[in-house]
Amino acid sequence: IVTPVVYSKVLSETIGEQVSLKLENQQTTGSFKIRGAINAISNLTPAQKKAGVVALSTGNHGRGLAYAANLMKIRCIICMSELVPNNKIEGIKALGAEVRLIGKNQDEAQVEADRLSIEEGMTYISPFDNVDVIAGQGTLGLEIHRQMPELKYAFVPLSGGGLICGV
């Protein structure tokens, strides 16, 4: 969904410049990650849709992918470490995905995601290293440009890099 941009009086007064915020927390799954997930799922071939998708996630990418896969009736497995909070696990399950809890860190969970991709032919959808995910995240930048054509600077959070690559 198109999310609003709102003026932040507190931040603007703090730094002495006009600051506006893009409210991606108002997305259906609570974050921008749904943008990339929907785009990636939409670009799967019929054979990929039949085999299903798999991803590694600590929460938001998994929620977005689970939501998108459920919309298209595609099998979805999200691999997570055993240290991920239960509310994130349950949130992903509630959106129709299977969750596999593997190991004490994301590297160990990644091994299971890779195995499913190789052995079961599932399509691995990275939260940041996937051209369709990055293009989907880029819709956020396009919206900002339409909503604020006079914008001079954009500050984009950086974790895996998928959002900033798209924007």
PLM features: residue spans?
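PLP-dependent amino-acid enzyme catalytic core
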Residues: 1-167
